[in-house]
Amino acid sequence: MNSPATLAAKLPWSEWLPQQRWYAGRNRELAAAEPGAVVALRDDLDLVLVDVSYTDGSAERYQVLVRWDAGPVSEFSTLATIGSADDHTGFDALYDPVAPQVLLSLIDSSAVRSSSDGQVSFAREPDVELPLDAYPRVSDAEQSNTSVIFDRGQAAILKVFRRVSSGINPDIELNRVLGRAHNPHVARLLGTYEIGIPGEPPEAACPLGMATAYAANAAEGWAMATASVRDLFAEGDLYAHEVGGDFAGESRRLGEAVASVHATLAEQLGTAQATFPVDHVLARLSSTAAAVPELQQYAGTIEERFVKLVDETISVQRVHGDLHLGQVLRTPESWVLIDFEGEPGQPLRERRAPDSPLRDVAGVLRSFEYAAYGPLVDHADDKQLAARAREWITRNRTAFCEGYAAASGNDPRDSELLLAAYELDKAVYEAGYESRHRPGWLPIPLRSIARLTAT
């Protein structure tokens, strides 16, 4: 068998990568895709970093684990087959039951694997156990990474980063801080792995993945909230608090959990004073309004709201950065926050920058609106449903803020103008996203923007 680097270079990366759901270059023209680093983890398993360049001059690096000549689970054979190189066939190893177990074992033993392209270092967290004999399955969640679940005994989930870059990964960083501080509202970090490139300083190492405790028997917040909305809509003669699926109690407990996480991050990593990020939100508003004609009628009012806060002093700290109901899980014991990676698509420096806790609060409040208004996308003229949706939103907003206030001593509603500004900034971001990816959902953020700019 040829060297790992030689074989990896012969795989048809330019054809395979664009078919993957975690590939971020769909709106750009691919110029080239070729391995930039290859490290053998064992004889038939290689870690490959694929360097992708685009005709607009931008570039990205993706992680793919390649298993040679061993087919994946049959249902994933088309998705996982990268292609042929000489007389060998390469597969995305995460869809093969053996390879994820190898990765978990390497983390458990804090192993090191090297080649001329780099050194891959695996590290287990102190005093943890990994389910080495558990059968892995790839999560079907739509996301920018690939997660493999080991659901047996001390269950774990291995998150393999796909688009990678050097520097401290905020998901690893904050999970480690919160776990070592024994905060009950995060899944405990079990281990990590990263690659160091020859000639680069240690701090330039590139994080590649992390294993955390798996929240077995957990329900996603989004699924719970949307089920509650469906129950309310089905009971036309009952108020929200009278419906069996009322979510307000969970919203209050979620507010308490978010406040707890914020308190731990402030205690462990500190706080500072800053001014409201007017330049940042105005830049987003300008670029989004230029791309979304439906937003332009509100742009002037939004700009006025932002500019009024130009001298506003705010307390900043490390926060989740992209909090919504899809980033929280309800276990039998409590709410758990996951995916501390920050806002998708932002540079690492910005994703690790301190921010106001109100950004996370606004993210949850915006998510309540999505949960309630989502069913109205196909019933835009149903005023009764719209009124029911607003009732549900108001009840759950109130419950969440009350829970946050009870746990932290600070009621987000006391910072009314700031909170509204963070909600507006989030809704502007959503308008840009929906315009590009789900035009039918664009009315959801626009409805909220109309409400926020009218008050």
UniProtKB/Swiss-Prot annotation:
Q: Which GO terms describe its molecular function?
A: ATP binding; kinase activity
- From the Swiss-Prot or TrEMBL record, give the protein name: Maltokinase
UniProt entry tagged with the keyword Hydrolase:
no
| Complex formation | Monomer.
**One GO term (biological process):** carbohydrate phosphorylation
Q: What is the reaction catalyzed?
A: D-maltose + ATP = alpha-maltose 1-phosphate + ADP + H(+)
Give the similarity note.
Answer: Belongs to the aminoglycoside phosphotransferase family.
Instruction: Please give the Pfam families that the UniProt record associates with this protein.
Output: Mak_N_cap
The Enzyme Commission number assigned here is 2.7.1.175
Keyword line: ATP-binding, Carbohydrate metabolism, Glycogen biosynthesis, Glycogen metabolism, Kinase, Nucleotide-binding, Transferase
Provide the function of this protein: Catalyzes the ATP-dependent phosphorylation of maltose to maltose 1-phosphate. Is involved in a branched alpha-glucan biosynthetic pathway from trehalose, together with TreS, GlgE and GlgB.
Pathway involvement of the protein, from the record: Glycan biosynthesis; glycogen biosynthesis
Q: Which domain of life does the protein's organism represent?
A: Bacteria
